[in-house]
């Protein structure tokens, strides 16, 4: 009888965890800690740190434990994007500092791809990050042809406001 109960317990835990009932708790990192890290990483790639900071807010509201079925961490990186820029294990995506390093590295890679085709702009960079470079290319690099994001921060960036979130230094 105890074996049946133990098996049922394991089955229920597996079922609930796969349905998202048992989730990681939020791990919201204070803006005052995130901002210096974002500035440091953005500078490495010649990116506007306020744009990157807005992306962190848009993706996770600065939650290091943010997770969807396909993306992890503060910058909501997919495993494919992660592997495009680092050999580090994807399990590290929940470490907010590593996630910012890799996420900004991925933004830097996308910036390089846009520069190569002479199409760089911050709205295009955001669209590439959100929907993929290939999806933007299929639309002739016209952000206006991309699906309008539900997220208000992304909507502002797509419309040309590349600094829609107040930074701690503002």
Give the positions of each predicted feature:
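Catalytic and substrate-binding regions of cell-wall glycan-acting enzymes that process beta-1,4-linked
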Residues: 120-170
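Extracellular/periplasmic catalytic domains that process cell-envelope and extracellular macromolecules
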Residues: 44-48, 68, 119-122
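Bacterial N-terminal signal peptides that target proteins for export
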Residues: 1-7
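Hydrophobic h-region of N-terminal signal peptides that target proteins for export
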Residues: 12-19
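Cell-wall polysaccharide-cleaving catalytic domain and substrate-binding groove, primarily
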Residues: 38, 42, 51, 55-86, ...
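Export/targeting segments at the very N-terminus of extracytoplasmic proteins
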Residues: 19-62, 89, 97-100, 115, ...
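Alpha-helical segment that forms one wall of the substrate-binding/catalytic cleft
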Residues: 79-138
């Amino acid at each position: 009888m105890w074996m049946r109960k133990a098996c049922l317990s394991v089955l229920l835990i597996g079922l609930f965890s796969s349905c998202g009932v048992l989730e990681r708790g939020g791990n919201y990192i204070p803006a005052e800690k995130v901002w210096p890290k974002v500035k440091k990483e953005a500078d490495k790639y010649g990116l506007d740190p306020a744009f990157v900071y807005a992306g962190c807010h848009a993706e996770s509201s600065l939650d290091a434990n943010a997770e969807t079925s396909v993306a992890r961490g503060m910058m909501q990186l997919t495993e494919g994007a992660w592997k495009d820029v680092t050999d580090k294990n994807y399990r590290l995506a929940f470490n907010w500092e590593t996630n910012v390093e890799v996420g900004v590295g991925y933004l830097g890679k996308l910036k390089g791809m846009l520069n190569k085709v002479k199409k760089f702009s911050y709205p295009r960079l955001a669209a590439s990050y959100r929907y993929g470079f290939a999806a933007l290319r299929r639309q002739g690099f016209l952000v206006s042809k991309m699906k309008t994001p539900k997220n208000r921060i992304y909507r502002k960036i797509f419309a040309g406001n590349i600094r829609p979130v107040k930074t701690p230094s503002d």
